[in-house]
Amino acid sequence: MTIIRKKHPLIKIINHSFIDLPTPSNISSWWNFGSLLGLCLIIQILTGLFLAMHYTSDTATAFSSVAHICRDVNYGWLIRYMHANGASMFFICLFLHVGRGIYYGSYNMIETWNMGIILLFAVMATAFMGYVLPWGQMSFWGATVITNLLSAIPYIGTTLVEWIWGGFSVDKATLTRFFAFHFILPFIITALVLVHLLFLHETGSNNPTGLNSDSDKIPFHPYYTVKDFLGVLFLFMAFMILTLFFPDILGDPDNYTPANPLNTPPHIKPEWYFLFAYAILRSIPNKLGGVVALILSILILALMPLLHTSKQRTLTFRPITQTIYWILVADLLTLTWIGGQPVEHPFIIIGQTASIAYFTIIMILMPIAGMIENNILNLD
């Protein structure tokens, strides 16, 4: 068996990635989320495939085809809710994974980090298009509002929006193409994940100390396969409790009303995992400015390696930056809350303050804190 594992051209690639992979001996449970994201992706592809067997991407039948899946297909309700809540679990793991990367300075592995940002954009695009497919009220109006943002692009904006819509409004052509893209993107994401892993295995994993761990490596299997399996159990438990007991808690009640272009819902808002970006978008009165801020709210992650001023890699021994980091986490939670609130006083000013704080913390406070810590520790 060992001979096959180490010599077979295909199996040896798997062996070097998941079995004999030299791994730092001290990585914590925060390093579990990579494998959990892989599991989430597999769950989403499988449940999505079974849903696609019964779904129809036509404005006249899309809503009723989802109802048919829940009522008439064997375990259709389970597949549908696993897919819907699987997206939420996916984003929880994604945010924790990115948060871990920021805390422990993993962004210094630039190729892996940039690949991760591309993956984040791809997953967000996939989730957005998936939300449109049930063709409920929030699906329709969410698609209308978000795609309409592209009209803010000077000169080509309006043409671009109509090109994406396939007409003069969100209609049958839009739904059909969104379904096509929603189906193909997860497979593209899978390919990008392999590239992400390829870059990661070029440098090896980071660890909580941020120090070079070449002198202290252990094989991934059995140590981290067992450790990851514990994470899988916790994820699966949370996922099943969510799916079986509270399947609609993260959804919007408006989406149980079929799409109606003549009736606007009182509060148009995306799924919870986009609310922080939506709050940043809404906090700027100018349309183009809002779109730029929305894109920058994610793209700012690409500046992380350039903004790293500290002589230490991680925040483990840096209490000042640690404090600022947790303020950033609180700020993101505030933005998420604001994104779900109506556009009125005091939510407008809170959203604007939180948006300014978000960019200020990342671009100004964290780099300054890094320099102060270098000074205190005489690392200059």
Curated annotation (Swiss-Prot):
Q: How is the cofactor bound?
A: Binds 2 heme b groups non-covalently.
- Record GO cellular component, one term: mitochondrial inner membrane
Compartments, record wording: Mitochondrion inner membrane
Protein residues bound to heme b b562: 83, 182
**Which controlled-vocabulary keywords does the entry list?**
Electron transport, Heme, Iron, Membrane, Metal-binding, Mitochondrion, Mitochondrion inner membrane, Respiratory chain, Transmembrane, Transmembrane helix, Transport, Ubiquinone
How would you describe this protein's topology in the membrane?
Multi-pass membrane protein
| Self-association and partners | The cytochrome bc1 complex contains 11 subunits: 3 respiratory subunits (MT-CYB, CYC1 and UQCRFS1), 2 core proteins (UQCRC1 and UQCRC2) and 6 low-molecular weight proteins (UQCRH/QCR6, UQCRB/QCR7, UQCRQ/QCR8, UQCR10/QCR9, UQCR11/QCR10 and a cleavage product of UQCRFS1). This cytochrome bc1 complex then forms a dimer.
Primary role: Component of the ubiquinol-cytochrome c reductase complex (complex III or cytochrome b-c1 complex) that is part of the mitochondrial respiratory chain. The b-c1 complex mediates electron transfer from ubiquinol to cytochrome c. Contributes to the generation of a proton gradient across the mitochondrial membrane that is then used for ATP synthesis.
What protein family is recorded?
Answer: Belongs to the cytochrome b family.
Q: What else is known?
A: Heme 1 (or BL or b562) is low-potential and absorbs at about 562 nm, and heme 2 (or BH or b566) is high-potential and absorbs at about 566 nm.
Name of the featured protein:
Cytochrome b
Please report the organism this UniProt entry assigns to the protein.
Answer: Microtus umbrosus (Zempoaltepec vole)
Q: What is the lineage of its organism?
A: Eukaryota, Metazoa, Chordata, Craniata, Vertebrata
Name of the coding gene: MT-CYB
